């Protein structure tokens, strides 16, 4: 090439195959990135007989059955496109179906897919029509009885209550993902890629609506109920940052379903990022300073399909205390779970919370109020706390955050308001 030829001309040629595939691209953002992603894919598929034809058939006839279109799985499962790494099925689902796709937690494979990402085979299917987007389940309303006639048999709440009513241990128990999660009560559903989490416990029957047929053995009989519905708030959570027992900075209100909390600085006030590097504290000691330097990329929170996931994208582990997560896995409510770098954990399940709340209303105001503890998640960066660490409380860790889940908290508030005053008023000494 002549020395005077602009470097940009090296990238100006787009092959006919890439142009054809880009014709099905969704959205108009990041044209160059999409072009490079498709070009990278075409080079891989041309080595496989019929793969290009199958992909074009799937894209041109989205309602028709299609075969898997696979590429080799990389060592870490990710694909690099123009200095950005991502999971291959997420990249191509974003290009051809959902431009606003944020995470693999939002995708589940169809039953017809033989090489879904979660199967950990040598090949991974990138056919965007072999995946579906996770839908947020509709939560049934909580039916608050005017007069309780509840027979507490087979209650999901029993285990939660018995554990919660005892005093907290001096030092919380510890668990590490994935080792401590292997012996869970239920196997992971095959549609949950890369996770060994059980599904939430199966619900017992919900209370019957007034006027609906009632089973003779139903625990809810002849009662008059007021339905209290779940409503999705504008900000699904708020995040407060602490150093030891000192609150630092303003509370971050999360409106985006994908939120990054990192140790860097971002003066642009990106609504998807909470940058802890921006926050100052005159009482900061050397331990805190050193810990802050290791937060790095921090934690990625996803709110998908009524579930909250925490993904550790820092080079150092994060430590999470979530009562909802602990309940799902049969741990003590105060257990602190270690999430190593590169791993993610489901830290809240709205459907499980709905089941517990629906049952708790029949046990009284105080038991419902106890569920407020389930709506707060504490998370420490770099340094752990609990029985296996010299720090026994989260307020002894250098850098930590407290996450309040607004939807469940507001639902609780409406249920408590409907229930009226407690028989034994809650106080600081109760």
UniProtKB/Swiss-Prot annotation:
Keywords: Cytoplasm, DNA-binding, Metal-binding, Nucleus, Phosphoprotein, Transcription, Transcription regulation, Zinc. Zn(2+) binds at residues 68, 113, 125, 130. Coiled coil: none annotated. Residues 186-222 are annotated as: Disordered. GO terms for biological process: BMP signaling pathway; bone development; cartilage development; hindbrain development; midbrain development; regulation of DNA-templated transcription; SMAD protein signal transduction; stem cell differentiation. The gene is Smad9. Pfam families: MH1, MH2. The keyword DNA-binding applies. GO terms for molecular function: DNA binding; metal ion binding. This is Mothers against decapentaplegic homolog 9. GO terms for cellular component: cytoplasm; nucleus; transcription regulator complex. Residues 202-221 have a biased composition (Polar residues). Phosphorylated on serine by BMP (bone morphogenetic proteins) type 1 receptor kinase and activin type I receptor-like kinases (ALK-2, ALK-3 and ALK-6). The keyword GTP-binding does not apply. Residues 16-140 form the MH1 domain. InterPro entries: Dwarfin, MAD_homology1_Dwarfin-type, MAD_homology_MH1, SMAD-like_dom_sf, SMAD_dom_Dwarfin-type, SMAD_FHA_dom_sf, SMAD_MH1_sf. Belongs to the dwarfin/SMAD family. Residues 236-430 form the MH2 domain. Interaction with the co-SMAD SMAD4. Interacts with PEBP2-alpha subunit. Interacts with RANBP3L. It is found in: Cytoplasm; Nucleus. Transcriptional modulator activated by BMP (bone morphogenetic proteins) type 1 receptor kinase. SMAD9 is a receptor-regulated SMAD (R-SMAD). Has been shown to be activated by activin type I receptor-like kinases (ALK-2, ALK-3, ALK-6) which stimulate heteromerization between SMAD9 and SMAD4. May play a role in osteoblast differentiation and maturation. Its main location: cytoplasm. Gene3D superfamilies: 2.60.200.10, SMAD MH1 domain (3.90.520.10).
């Amino acid at each position: 090439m002549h020395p005077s030829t602009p470097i940009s001309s090296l990238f100006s040629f787009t092959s006919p195959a890439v142009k054809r595939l880009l014709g099905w691209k969704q959205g108009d953002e990041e044209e160059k990135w999409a072009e490079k992603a498709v070009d990278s894919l075409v080079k891989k598929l041309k080595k496989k007989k019929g793969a290009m034809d199958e992909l074009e058939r799937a894209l041109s006839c989205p309602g028709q059955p299609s075969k898997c279109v696979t590429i080799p799985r990389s060592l870490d499962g990710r694909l690099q496109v123009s200095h950005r790494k991502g999971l291959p099925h997420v990249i191509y689902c974003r290009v051809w179906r959902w431009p606003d796709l944020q995470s693999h937690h939002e995708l589940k494979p169809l039953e017809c897919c033989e090489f879904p990402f979660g199967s950990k085979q040598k090949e991974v299917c990138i056919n965007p029509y072999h995946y579906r987007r996770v839908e947020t389940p509709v939560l049934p309303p909580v039916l608050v009885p005017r007069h309780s006639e509840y027979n507490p048999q087979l209650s999901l709440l029993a285990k939660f209550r018995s554990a919660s009513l005892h005093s907290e241990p001096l030092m919380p128990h510890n668990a590490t993902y994935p080792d401590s999660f292997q012996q869970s009560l239920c196997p992971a559903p095959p549609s949950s890629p890369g996770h060994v989490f059980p599904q939430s416990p199966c619900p017992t029957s919900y209370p019957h609506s007034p006027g609906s047929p009632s089973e003779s053995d139903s625990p809810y009989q002849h009662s008059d109920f007021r339905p209290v519905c779940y409503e999705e708030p504008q900000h699904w959570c708020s995040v407060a940052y602490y150093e030891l027992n000192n609150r630092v900075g303003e509370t971050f209100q999360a409106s985006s379903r994908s939120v990054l909390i990192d140790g860097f600085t971002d003066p642009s006030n990106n609504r998807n990022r909470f940058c802890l590097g921006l926050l100052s504290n005159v009482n900061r000691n050397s331990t805190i300073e050193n810990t802050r330097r290791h937060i790095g990329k921090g934690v990625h929170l996803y709110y998908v399909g009524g579930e909250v996931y925490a993904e550790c994208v820092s080079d150092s582990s994060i430590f999470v205390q979530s009562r909802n997560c602990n309940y799902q896995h049969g741990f003590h409510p105060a257990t602190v779970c270690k999430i190593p770098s590169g791993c993610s954990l489901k830290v809240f399940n709205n459907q499980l919370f709905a089941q517990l709340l629906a049952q708790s209303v029949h046990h009284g105001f105080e038991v419902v109020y106890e569920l407020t503890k389930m709506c707060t998640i504490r998370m420490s960066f770099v340094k752990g706390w609990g029985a296996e660490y010299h720090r026994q409380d989260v307020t002894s860790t250098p850098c930590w955050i407290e996450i309040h889940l607004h939807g469940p908290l507001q639902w609780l508030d409406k249920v408590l308001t409907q229930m009226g005053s407690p028989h034994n008023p809650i106080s600081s000494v109760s």
